[in-house]
């Protein structure tokens, strides 16, 4: 692989390596601050999201899931039609939502940096978002492969506490947020906000913890609503 180097006034700034975020995140985030990379990482992360979402949807037996819903009065053929629509609708939703999040998250990160007294740009935060999202998208891919090749419950990540601790309803939704790749990405986010956003380590960690806390609360209420709706 050729070395990406940009020369400027006698100095050389290396282009950040997307997969380098796995082994040397601090170095990549410092490079992003000087030379944010977008298009290459965007194509790679988007491709991983698409493959992961497709595998997870194809590995989900929606006919079985629909049996637990209020589907009385539907014939077997109608059930199959609903299951097919749900499968491909869920697949499209996961792909569109996953890619849209890549562009929405940088706005939140930008706000975190501004509130913490740092100075940054949307492009730098977009690059940071793509590098951090590599980890969560790899998690989606891993869980997609597991769902496609095994009979595990695809509603909850096998790499989360929900995949280890038997639970359902709101508790399962909360446990599902404590997922290896998700937590890893939030740790990288804390480092990235410090290195790329230029804010203090403390501010970076506080921002990441608050965002993770919001995710947990959202999952709790989502689980409660689904439990009530399914009651």
UniProtKB/Swiss-Prot annotation:
Keywords from the UniProt entry: Cell membrane, Membrane, Transmembrane, Transmembrane helix
Entry's localization field: Cell membrane
- One short Pfam family name for this protein? Yip1
Q: What induces it?
A: Expressed in exponential-phase cells.
By its UniProt entry, which InterPro entries does this protein fall under? Answer: Yip1_dom
Ranges annotated as spanning the membrane:
38-58, 93-113, 128-148, 171-191, 205-225
Describe its membrane topology.
Answer: Multi-pass membrane protein
Q: Report the GO terms under cellular component.
A: plasma membrane
Top-rank lineage group of the source organism: Bacteria
Name the principal localization, coarsely classed.
membrane
Function field: Part of an unusual four-component transporter, which is required for protection against the killing factor SdpC (sporulation-delaying protein). Has a role in the assembly of the YknXYZ complex.
Q: How does it assemble?
A: Interacts with a complex composed of YknX, YknY and YknZ.
- Protein name per UniProt: Membrane protein YknW
Which source organism does the UniProt entry give? Bacillus subtilis (strain 168)
**Recorded name of the encoding gene:** yknW
């Amino acid at each position: 692989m050729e070395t990406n180097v940009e020369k400027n006034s006698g100095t050389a700034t290396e282009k950040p390596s997307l997969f380098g975020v796995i082994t040397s995140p601090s170095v990549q985030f410092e490079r992003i601050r000087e030379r944010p990379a977008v298009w290459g990482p965007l194509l790679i992360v988007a491709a991983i999201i698409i493959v992961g979402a497709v595998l997870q949807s194809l590995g989900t037996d929606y006919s079985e899931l629909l049996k637990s819903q209020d589907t009385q009065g539907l014939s077997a053929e109608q059930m199959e039609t609903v299951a097919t629509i749900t499968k491909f609708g869920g697949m499209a939703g996961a792909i569109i939502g996953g890619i849209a999040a890549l562009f929405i998250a940088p706005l939140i990160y930008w706000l975190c940096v501004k509130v913490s007294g740092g100075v940054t740009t949307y492009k730098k935060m977009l690059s940071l978002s793509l590098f951090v999202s590599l980890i969560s998208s790899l998690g989606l891919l891993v869980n997609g492969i597991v769902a496609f090749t095994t009979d595990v419950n695809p509603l909850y990540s096998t790499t989360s506490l929900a995949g280890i601790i038997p639970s359902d309803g709101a508790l399962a939704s909360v446990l599902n947020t404590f997922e290896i790749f998700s937590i890893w990405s939030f740790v990288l986010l804390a480092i990235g906000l410090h290195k790329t956003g230029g804010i203090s380590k403390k501010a970076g960690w506080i921002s990441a913890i608050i965002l993770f806390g919001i995710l947990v609360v959202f999952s709790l209420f989502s689980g409660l609503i689904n439990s009530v709706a399914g009651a």
